[in-house]
């Protein structure tokens, strides 16, 4: 069965969005959840986070946005609810208790006069319990029905993708209509550059021409990791000029040993440009995954 998703940067989430994040690293979690929480605090929205973490341990707030969230917890704008209180009964995940807790928090935020409420929880721990995946599926389906028609609620359900099997991740993802991702590194309406984390690299969308070489080179340098491959996802890239290919070749040659660039999901028209130049003239650059025709 084909499933439809809206893919949205975290900064574009809006009330009614019940979003899914299966993060591949702490950095990805910080960039999505940290921005989600920060944006809510910055716009005077209520933020509810189901977690046993202390305020200074929340992803991305101190390390990325350089703010201490403690004052926001003291005035009630940021509400941290421990797992035992929010969704555990006799030490086990209790979906009914989770749903009741979140619905109550939504009602309280509305009574307090907030124009919107943001909800999030890292549920990887629940998936590791016996039968946790099935319990999570039921909980997510009911929560989707509650959030989708809302005019003031948005939520991100987050898990570490290593906490469960690919099949479980797919089933849980399919209970959401929105897939949330990091905000773009660059977007001028012609070229959009977004960080990717599994695999590590960048996704390019639109057209990469001479006017955007500098920003592309700068962004590419920012994701370099010694002795690691950098993947460039070309699925949505409709045009790349010869100057950009030359830039890639120069960059690849300068990468430390063991590094290199991998071009994933090459479109036929983009591949034709590369074939015209010749792969042998692009040392350090290799074809990656994705079919080409």
Please give the residue ranges for each predicted region.
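STAS-like cytosolic regulatory interaction modules
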Residues: 71-74, 149, 159-239, 243-293
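Positively charged, polar, low-complexity stretches
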Residues: 1-192, 272
């Amino acid at each position: 069965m084909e499933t439809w998703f809206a893919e949205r940067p975290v900064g574009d989430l809006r009330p009614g969005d019940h979003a899914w994040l299966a993060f591949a690293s702490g950095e990805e979690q910080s960039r999505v959840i940290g921005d989600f929480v920060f944006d809510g605090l910055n716009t005077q929205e209520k933020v509810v986070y189901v977690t046993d973490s202390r305020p200074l341990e929340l992803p991305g707030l101190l390390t990325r946005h350089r703010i201490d969230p403690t004052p926001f917890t003291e005035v009630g704008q940021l509400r941290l609810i421990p797992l035992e209180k929010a969704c555990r009964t006799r030490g086990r995940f209790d979906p009914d208790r989770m749903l009741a807790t979140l619905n109550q928090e939504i009602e309280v935020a509305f009574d307090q006069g907030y124009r919107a409420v943001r909800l999030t929880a890292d549920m990887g721990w629940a998936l590791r319990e016996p039968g946790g995946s099935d319990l999570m599926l039921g909980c997510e389906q009911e929560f989707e029905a509650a959030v989708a028609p809302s005019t003031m609620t948005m939520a991100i359900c987050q898990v570490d993708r290593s906490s469960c099997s690919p099949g479980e991740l797919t089933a849980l993802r399919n209970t959401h209509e929105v897939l949330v991702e990091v905000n773009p590194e660059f977007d001028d309406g012609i070229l959009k550059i977004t960080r990717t984390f599994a695999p590590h690299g960048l996704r390019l969308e639109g057209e990469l021409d001479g006017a955007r070489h500098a920003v592309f080179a700068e962004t590419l340098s920012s994701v370099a990791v010694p002795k690691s491959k950098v993947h460039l996802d070309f699925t949505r890239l409709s045009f790349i000029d010869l100057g950009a290919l030359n830039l890639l070749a120069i960059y690849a040659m300068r990468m430390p040993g063991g590094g290199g660039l991998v071009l994933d999901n090459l479109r036929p028209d983009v591949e034709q440009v590369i074939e015209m130049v010749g792969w042998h003239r692009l040392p350090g650059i290799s074809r990656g995954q994705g079919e080409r025709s």
